Amino acid sequence: MSDILNKILDVKADEVAAAKKYRSLASLRDEVEGNKEARAAIRGFEASLRAKIAAGQAGIIAEIKKASPSKGVIRPDFHPADIAVSYEKNGAACLSVLTDVQFFQGAPEYLKQARTACALPALRKDFMIDPYQLYEARSWGADCILLIVAALDHGLMAELEACAHELGMNVLVEVHNAEELTAALKLKTSLLGVNNRNLRTFETSLQTTLDLLPRISPDKLVITESAIVTPDDVKKMRDADVHAFLVGEAFMRAPDPGVELGRLFN
């Protein structure tokens, strides 16, 4: 595990502990489980991706991200609702919205604003380590949550996956290498993200996805993450029968993120 990931997880544990003192899990659970309208309004994250792919298009998870630990502020002019509308207009299947405050300058409000502004399902992009965060995610409107294998042991991963599914959310499990893939394949979810960014060096290479593909069964929906910068990168993945993408920085640095999505994928 990288030093930065360790640091993030330590902070995340403190954040969850503080949140529980402010509001108990029992109280949050009662709110989420008692809100039948919100449960009925969950948008199918996996279904949206598969519908795009079935129509011969790329299934694009378009990310809304203001900053990152390695790059600092990526988009100073940051309006989540406007970005979400532009993504939807230009063919995105889903949203990914950063809610981590300290390291990515995200916020729960950004998730709420983005999802309310459009009809796309939304992923809470954060470092999930406790069931409490899943109830938070659902209360904010998330349709999917992220589990990062590098950050979790298998028992906790399985517990978080089961909790998310009970709440009606999809689960995207993220891996960086073959060892993590072996652990991820023990989960039930079909959504398998391959992050092309090395957690130690922060360098990116699409070869990471290509190397892991032969180990993944066809029933899994492979989502390649990071390192998608040019139309040639997209073609390289689609030629390898990878049709789902999570892209953030390439869109966020453009004047209009949705227009850049259209340029990159059409």
Curated annotation (Swiss-Prot):
The keyword Amino-acid biosynthesis applies. Pathway: Amino-acid biosynthesis; L-tryptophan biosynthesis; L-tryptophan from chorismate: step 4/5. It is an enzyme of class 4 (lyase). GO terms for molecular function: indole-3-glycerol-phosphate synthase activity; phosphoribosylanthranilate isomerase activity. Its EC number is 4.1.1.48. It catalyses: 1-(2-carboxyphenylamino)-1-deoxy-D-ribulose 5-phosphate + H(+) = (1S,2R)-1-C-(indol-3-yl)glycerol 3-phosphate + CO2 + H2O. One of its GO terms (biological process) is L-tryptophan biosynthetic process. Disulfide bonds: none annotated. The keyword Transmembrane helix does not apply. Pfam families: IGPS. CDD domains: IGPS (cd00331). Keywords: Amino-acid biosynthesis, Aromatic amino acid biosynthesis, Decarboxylase, Lyase, Tryptophan biosynthesis. Belongs to the TrpC family. This is Indole-3-glycerol phosphate synthase.
